[in-house]
């Protein structure tokens, strides 16, 4: 098991602007070369799609980086971002509750047809532990899981999970169910996701 302790862990969600797919394709090698520089601290990465899997939404990267300045530089100096592929970026500190990378996921590689999802819950509340709160999603189905944090590393502002599930509704269950979710999260977003990196 790999546990990163050297710096700060960050969740970065770059969301594409409409009509940027051709530019994204043109800059793919530059993007990969840029990410190669952060390989030792990479916890998870990959493209994100609409819940039906049909349309590319953007990409996520979860990485261990030296400090706040390093996190901002990682997100904003990325070639796609600099070239205008993305319309916006969500950058937050994050805590690796499971203490592993996506490459250590017991279920193996999560590809296009393997039921991978990004679950993003935004809102305050208690920091979740490593146990999924819905019986439909077990810890073995969690690729990564942890709270989103403010810069101070203490104030929780949400939860992020990459999970393997049979449906978007099942994936959403990692945050809980019914009133529990509604009371803790102002917004819950679920997207399709798959392992990223060099092909």
Positions of the model-derived regions?
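Conserved, structured core segments of small domains
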Residues: 1-199
